[in-house]
UniProtKB/Swiss-Prot annotation:
This is Profilin-3. GO terms for biological process: actin nucleation; chemotaxis to cAMP; negative regulation of actin filament polymerization; positive regulation of actin filament polymerization. InterPro entries: PFN, PFN_euk, PFN_sf, Profilin_CS. GO terms for molecular function: actin binding; actin monomer binding; phosphatidylinositol-4,5-bisphosphate binding. Keywords: Actin-binding, Cytoplasm, Cytoskeleton. The gene is proC. One of its GO terms (cellular component) is cell cortex. Its main location: cytoplasm. Transmembrane segments: none annotated.
Length: 126
């Protein structure tokens, strides 16, 4: 399966409004949903937040110029919220999944879908 297929099938198909797969090494984009792109600055901030989860909690996570309040952050996942929507970030060995949801998708369902893809990618060595 291509990286784009993971986005289209597992994330967008699960109800996310936007998604992107970044390299966990340098933050470069491997695939993204149509019209969605995490900026280089945002990607670097995400990488640094996975290295220091306290930074995520203190500074929040900005995706597409929207600052989200961090609810949970550790070395494998970051959950953040803005109004009725939010973002789930999941880090694997080689990737960072970025999945943005709105009020049509419950936060728990968003986390489960993104974490499930992250678990699958880890099992596959990614």
């Amino acid at each position: 399966m291509t990286w784009q297929a993971y986005i289209d099938t597992n994330l967008i198909g699960s109800g996310f409004i936007s998604a992107q797969i970044l390299s966990s090494a340098d933050g470069s984009s491997w695939a993204n949903s149509n019209g969605f792109s995490v900026s280089a600055t945002e990607a670097q901030h995400i990488l640094s937040c996975f290295k220091d989860s306290n930074k995520a909690s203190a500074m929040g996570i900005t995706i597409n110029n929207v600052k989200n309040f961090v609810l949970k952050a550790d070395d494998k996942s970051i959950y953040a919220k803005k109004d009725a929507g939010g973002v789930v970030l999941v880090k694997t060995n080689q990737t960072i999944l970025v999945a943005v949801y709105n009020s049509n998708l419950q936060p728990g369902a968003a986390a489960n879908a993104c974490e499930a893809l992250g678990d699958y990618l880890r099992e596959q060595g990614f």
